[in-house]
Each structure stands twice: as structure tokens, then as C-alpha cells.
Amino acid sequence: IIVANHPHGLVDGMILADLIGRVRTDYKILTRSLLTDVEEIQQFMIPVPFPHEDDALKKNLDMRKQAMAHLSNGGVIVIFPSGVVASSETMFGPAIEAEWNPFTAKMILRSGATVVPVRFTGQNSRWYQMANRISPALRQGLLLHEVVHAVNKPQAPIVGEPLDPSEIDARKDNPRGCMEWLRARTLGLS
């Protein structure tokens, strides 16, 4: 399981897909369902439903089942545990990575998979941060601008060492605490 922070949105997934694809092709990225309709990349995606979607609970259970089956077959799962792009709390503040979802801890613990943390540096533009404070629709519209803007910039994610399973196992009784630890560990990579 590869866990990563999510400061840029779509760009983060594109970079991880490129890096992993150089080594192996049995990876799947947990991503919003609107991205899974692109035929050329469909095989590398597992859709994560938006909470407001019809049958969101059923779709969420299906997503978890697919992810666990893929892991049990020896595949790689890529997940952005915050589930959202990092954003500033004010118009001019720094982007902050949201709390990480305890579902990731449960998936890690149930699967027994090796965990590799990845940290992306930087953040989306100030325009994006301001749009985020004004309107979700405006924010979403600017995400494509951010992708185009990022294409011409070098990206250098920091890939951490695989985590010692005993460190994760020591936190098995507290999934939320496990994710706080894993988030801090990932954001601390340098």
C-alpha cells in the first residue's frame, strides 16, 4: 500500500502512476469515480464514490472489497488517505493536508500489506487556495488549470522506506491514532 499526501490533486496520482508503472503494472489507485470513466486508465483505478452519490454506501463497500481483493492477489494499492486536495484555511494561508481517514488503517491492518509513504512537496497556486474559500465549483474548475501549470514544472516526490510492520501493529487498537502517526510520518519525509 502506498500512502501519500495530496497537495496538488490529479497531478499527484499521475506522478505516482508514472513512477509505479516503471516498475510494475499491477497497481490500482483509489480515486474519485469521475476519473474512472477514461478507458485508457480504467484498469489502474478503483472508484471512490462521492458521499452524495446514489448508493454511496454500497459503492463504498464495493470499493473496499475490490481494494482488499487486489491486495490479497499481491497487487499495489495507492491511496490518498485525506481524500481531498490540501487547501488553506484562509485566503492567504498555507495549504494544509486534511486529517487522514481511519479506513486506510483498517485496510493496512486487515491486509498485512507493506506500507510505503510518499510525500509531495508544494501546494496548488494562491488562486486555487482563494477559489477554495469562495466556491467548490470555482475550486474544481481551477484544478485543470493546476494540472496544466504543473506539467511544465519538475516534480520530485519523496519516497520513504517501507514501514516496519511492528510499528503499524503497535497501533492496531487505535485506527485514528495510527493514521495520525502515519500522516505525521509521511509529512515529515525529507
PLM feature segments, named:
Residues 4-56:
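Catalytic core of membrane glycerolipid acyltransferases/transacylases, capturing the structured
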